[in-house]
């Protein structure tokens, strides 16, 4: 029997929407987190109400964020990666 490969579909940040990868540094409460973004900026992230109950975020999680146009020090959390997706991102060189 040949070994089957598991296919992992991973959403990557979209450059046209100015999305970046980030790691959650700390939880601030009230749907807010501190993020260490891959572009070198520390941002205050906001979890939108539509994703609040669906997406449980903890320290150390890797997420996609969209920085605000008005204030670059703040961002909205768009997507949270699972552990197999984070491993795939590391293998492909998206995470440093």
Swiss-Prot record:
Identify the taxonomic lineage of the organism of origin. Answer: Archaea, Methanobacteriati, Methanobacteriota, Stenosarchaea group, Methanomicrobia
Q: What does this protein do?
A: Seems to be required for maximal rate of protein biosynthesis. Enhances ribosome dissociation into subunits and stabilizes the binding of the initiator Met-tRNA(I) to 40 S ribosomal subunits.
Ranges of residues in domain S1-like: 8-82
- Matches recorded under Gene3D superfamilies: Nucleic acid-binding proteins
Which species is this UniProt entry from? Methanosarcina barkeri (strain Fusaro / DSM 804)
Classification via SMART domains: eIF1a (SM00652)
Highest taxon in the source lineage: Archaea
Q: Which UniProt keywords apply?
A: Initiation factor, Protein biosynthesis
Q: What terms describe the molecular function in GO for this protein?
A: RNA binding; translation initiation factor activity
Q: Which family does it belong to?
A: Belongs to the eIF-1A family.
User: Under which name does UniProt file this protein?
Assistant: Translation initiation factor 1A 1
- PANTHER family of this UniProt entry? EIF-1A
Q: Which InterPro entries match?
A: NA-bd_OB-fold, RNA-binding_domain_S1_IF1, TIF_eIF-1A, TIF_eIF-1A_CS
- Its gene is eif1a1
- A Pfam family annotated for this chain is eIF-1a
